[in-house]
Design a protein with these regions (language model features):
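Early-domain small/polar-rich strand-loop-helix modules and first-structured segments
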Residues: 1-95, 168-171, 175, 219-226, ...
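Gly/Thr-rich phosphate-binding beta-strand-loop-beta motif of the actin/hexokinase/Hsp70
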Residues: 1-25, 185-226, 377, 516-541
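Acidic, glycine/GT-rich loop-and beta-edge segments that sit at the periphery of enzyme/chaperone cores
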Residues: 7-9, 33-37, 193, 250-297, ...
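Phosphate-binding loop and its immediate beta->loop->alpha context
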Residues: 27-162, 171, 239-285, 289-330, ...
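Phosphate/ATP-binding catalytic cores across multiple sugar-kinase/actin-like superfamilies
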Residues: 116-131, 179-191, 315-363, 381, ...
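Glycine-rich phosphate-binding loops at beta-strand->alpha-helix junctions
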Residues: 139-154, 292-293, 340-345, 362-385, ...
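Acidic low-complexity intrinsically disordered segments
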Residues: 165, 288-359, 421-638, 642-653, ...
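Conserved phosphate-binding catalytic cores of ATP/NTP-utilizing and phosphoryl-transfer enzymes
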Residues: 169-201, 405-424
Length: 868
């Protein structure tokens, strides 16, 4: 069978074609598979769509019952998993859902939820038994056109976990167009003319996708080519639900809890469908359950009218804007609900205008897709908008059953692709891909339009790879650059709209020696499943090294605004490296003299050393690691300068490998453990590197620190040097990846001790780091519960000089799960009112280099690039 699966944000569906049923081989009949699912307690029915919801109850029901039960107990409902797959601010493989349930209630990862939805459909198909196991069929699984490579790979991983290892990915707008071809082409071909441009406007529950397809016609011969794809927009029907929920909460006149808001949102989603689809329905009543012992008696009531829903939908999301009006660049989205980073401007009109201007094409026709456009009034509004912009009304290509169009189109594509019958849309890869060179340039790896199976090679004389150590590449992509060719070096203009992906990394093993340069060719291929495969081929051997995405790491988004990096000549760097060798290899320079001598030869104070120079020094310190054992003084200097040059452990190519090298000395401890200063510098060293370590590595450090900081009941606190204790606390507080419960215990223990001994700057820094609403490097799913931060704010209410701590503990993120309650925020605001910190507290300004340095505990290297 030729199967299409729509893994939707709100609803999923499965359709198939039996080639043996095709009387007309170009347009075979498409069947929709009805999916059995629980619709009420003890009742199972088959439905044409599977709501993309999982309810965390016995058996973890999926679908209609899960969605409806979630409206009653929203903190046990998992939804919008597809939106989370594209959210690089979190670890998408970690158990972070449901987001609003808090750490103890988060039991599934976005990948696991997606796998469960797919496996539910697979189990239903297999149990039906008519056509053999689903895993043996020709399957096409759809993804948003704007999904980047990381999100696509995670989608494939989810399918593999669900038992579907063999499949192809197809972009949802293309699937919608294939559905139109399958169901309408024969009778609508008269509408098609040569040069015609069709806009596919696909707005679902969580994402908006725009694509353009151009028609080529020569008599009866008609071809379609995709010519443009819009960038990823986390904006859809969910945002309208949130807007209606905001309106209802305003009318209720009471601030609701997270649980109440989740239930309200589900009611508003149902109200939206009723009010926008049925003009006879003038209002819908909204009921919000009370909290605590007065769940029923304390319930709240209001209503949403059709007029209100229309005004918000039409004027808020589809306003009749001027053609040249661009999306508004707000500091953060007004609709950042439940952790998802929705776009700041909800006006789909402005995003569509920006896309069409970038594409440089005027649509002659529109094909709508996605649940957002089920109400006819919203489809009409987009047609009005295009007529308003271009002076002509576009032809409307109708797709029946918008909830099923993607699945049926995917099934048609599976059929056409595997049988050679039917019609295929050309267009290939929607992005051009580049390997970054320096800060502002790159070499084109794969051009936009590369077709499935195409192999591209970049063979340049100047391409060499460092062997016998891990290497990392910056991978960039563009949706708008159309003329670049493989191997071309491009200097990107300032403001170029580039997407920076998670880095590509590989371990290059070559020969038995140490580091060496190997001449290579770069290769890439758009695989049959629709993902990008990249590799390096040696020119002097048969070796091939695959480059893999580091999906657990956040991709770098924007450089931190701050000091420009100084430029230091290679001769000066070489002189600085020779000073280090003179000190550690030859003993010609006393270790305590080395910092001043380095500053003198570099002509810069050490806080101004650029990151590239610092990392070259760090590499030499790591090479000379055994030389630290010459004396206690040498170890102190090695730890102090080595850690300083490697701080903060990430943000520069090769840092992961440097951390692995540094970790080799951890288990043995300091070489001169009986010296207090060596122990102090030992913990400073690991605190500086903490951001580059993974969860397990940080756990090793915590395991060694915690007995000294929080002894088990019945054991006395070990007496130690105050400076050593202070640095141990700072290092423990820098471990953002250890369990939240452990970090809560650390903060509580520190506050308890400080109430007896006093609140010094180190205590305040540790508390601010542990309870930060926006972590220095950790993903958003590692932020401590807002109730904990609120409790710590109250504990600091009467303590002087807490402005920085208050900003960290109470900074607004726009995510109600992370933001502290109003009372705690008011305490923090009262401490910073009238100071420059108020903008940071309100979340109105991005964290600049100074703010990040304050969070880290010291200045960061100039030129360092961190995630925004």
């Amino acid at each position: 069978m030729k199967v299409g699966i729509d893994l939707g944000t709100t609803n999923s569906a499965l359709a198939w074609i039996d080639p043996d049923d095709a009387e007309d081989t170009s347009f075979p009949p498409i069947q929709v598979f009805e999916i059995p699912q629980m619709v009420a307690a003890g009742r199972v029915e088959s439905r044409r769509t599977l709501p993309s919801f999982v309810f965390l109850d016995e058996g973890q029901p999926v679908g209609t019952y899960a969605r409806d039960q979630g409206a009653i107990v929203p903190t046990r409902l998992v939804h919008s998993a597809k939106s989370w797959l594209s959210n690089s601010e979190v670890d998408r493989t970690a158990k972070i859902l449901p987001w609003d349930a808090g750490e103890g209630g988060r039991v599934m990862s976005p990948v696991e939820v997606s796998a469960k939805l797919i496996s539910t459909m697979r189990d239903a198909w297999d149990k039906d038994g008519r056509y053999g196991p689903l895993a043996e069929q020709d399957i096409v699984l759809t993804v948003p056109a704007s999904f980047d490579e990381e999100a696509r790979e995670l989608t494939v991983r989810a399918a593999e976990e669900a038992g579907l290892a063999k499949l192809t990915l197809l972009e949802e707008p293309a699937a919608a167009f294939y559905s139109w071809i399958a169901n309408n082409f024969a009778r609508s071909r008269r509408l098609l003319f040569d040069g015609q441009v069709v806009l596919i406007c696909d707005v679902g529950g969580g994402t908006s996708d725009f694509s353009l397809i151009k028609v080529s016609r020569d008599g009866d011969r008609i071809n379609f080519t995709r010519t443009a794809v819009g960038k990823h927009l986390l904006l859809g029907g969910d945002n309208l639900d949130l807007t209606l929920a905001w309106l209802a909460e305003t009318k209720l006149g009471k601030q609701l809890s997270i649980r109440q808001r989740s239930g309200l949102r589900r009611q508003c989603s149902a109200a939206k469908e009723l009010l926008l689809c049925d003009e006879r329905r003038q209002s819908v009543e909204i009921n919000v359950l009370g909290t605590g012992s007065s769940i029923i008696g304390g319930s709240l009531k209001t209503e949403i009218t059709r007029a209100e829903a229309l005004e918000l939908a039409l004027e808020g999301f589809l306003p009749l804007t001027p053609r040249g009006e661009k999306p508004k660049e707000e500091k953060r989205s007004l609709f950042r609900e439940l952790g998802l980073p929705y776009v700041a401007d909800p006006a789909i009109s402005r995003h569509l205008a920006a896309f069409l201007e970038s594409a440089g094409q005027v649509p002659d026709a529109i094909l709508f897709n996605g649940g957002f456009f089920i109400p006819e009034i919203l489809r009409t509004r987009v047609a009005d908008l295009l007529e308003h912009w271009y002076g002509k009304r576009p032809e409307i290509f109708e797709n029946r059953d918008l909830d099923l169009a993607v699945a049926t189109g995917a099934a048609y594509y599976s059929y056409a692709r595997s049988t050679g019958s039917g019609i295929l849309v050309r267009g290939g890869l929607p992005r051009s891909y580049y390997i970054g060179i320096g800060e502002t340039s790159g070499v084109c790896l794969v051009p936009r339009g590369a077709e499935e199976g195409d192999v591209v090679e970049v063979d340049r004389e100047d391409l060499q790879l460092v062997a016998n150590k891990p290497v990392a590449f910056r991978l960039l992509s563009s949706l708008t650059r159309t003329d670049d060719v493989p191997g071309q070096v491009i200097e990107f203009p300032e403001g170029e709209d580039l997407h920076q992906h998670a880095p590509l990394e590989a371990v290059i093993r070559f020969g038995k020696g140490g580091e060496r340069l190997v001449p290579v060719k770069l290769g890439a291929r758009l695989t049959e499943i629709g993902t990008l495969e990249t590799w390096c081929d040696s020119k002097v051997s048969d070796n091939r090294w695959r480059l893999q995405f580091q999906l657990r790491k956040q991709s770098v988004k924007n450089p931190v605004a701050g000091r420009p990096a100084a430029v230091v000549s290679q001769e000066v760097v070489d002189a600085a490296l020779e000073l280090v060798r003179s000190a550690f290899e030859k003993g010609d320079i006393a270790p305590e003299e080395l910092p001043a001598r380095l500053e003198a030869v570099l002509g810069l104070g050490r806080n101004s050393w650029p990151v590239d120079v610092a990392r070259k020094l760090a590499d030499l310190f790591l090479e000379l690691v055994e030389r630290r054992k010459r004396s206690a003084a040498y170890e102190i200097r090695w730890l102090n300068l080595g850690g300083f040059c490697l701080r903060p452990g990430f943000g520069y190519m090769g840092d992961e490998f440097r951390i692995e090298q540094a970790r080799r000395i951890y288990s043995a401890g300091p070489a001169f453990a009986n010296q207090a200063q060596n122990e102090i510098d030992w913990w400073i060293f690991w605190g500086r590197l903490a951001g580059g370590m993974n969860k397990n590595q940080q756990g090793d450090i915590a395991q060694r620190l915690l007995p000294s900081l929080m002894p088990k009941p019945g054991k006395k606190l070990q007496r130690m040097n105050n400076s050593l204790l202070r640095e141990m606390w700072r290092t423990a507080s820098s471990l953002e990846l250890i369990p939240a419960a452990t970090r809560v215990q650390l903060g509580d223990a520190l506050l308890k001790e400080a109430k007896q001994t006093g609140f010094n700057p180190v205590v305040l820094w540790c508390i601010s780091r542990l309870g930060a609403r926006q972590l220095f490097y950790g993903p958003a799913n590692q932020v401590l519960p807002s109730a904990i931060a609120a409790r710590w704010i109250e504990a600091l209410a009467a303590v002087p000089n807490t402005e920085d701590a208050m900003v960290s503990l109470a900074r607004r993120t726009g995510d109600p799960v992370r933001d502290v309650p109003a009372a705690a925020f008011a305490i923090a605001r009262s401490r910073v009112t009238g100071t420059s910190a108020i903008a940071q507290l309100e979340g109105d300004t991005a964290r600049d280099e100074r703010a990040l340095g304050r969070i880290f505990g010291e200045d960061l290297p100039s030129g360092l690039v961190l995630g925004s």
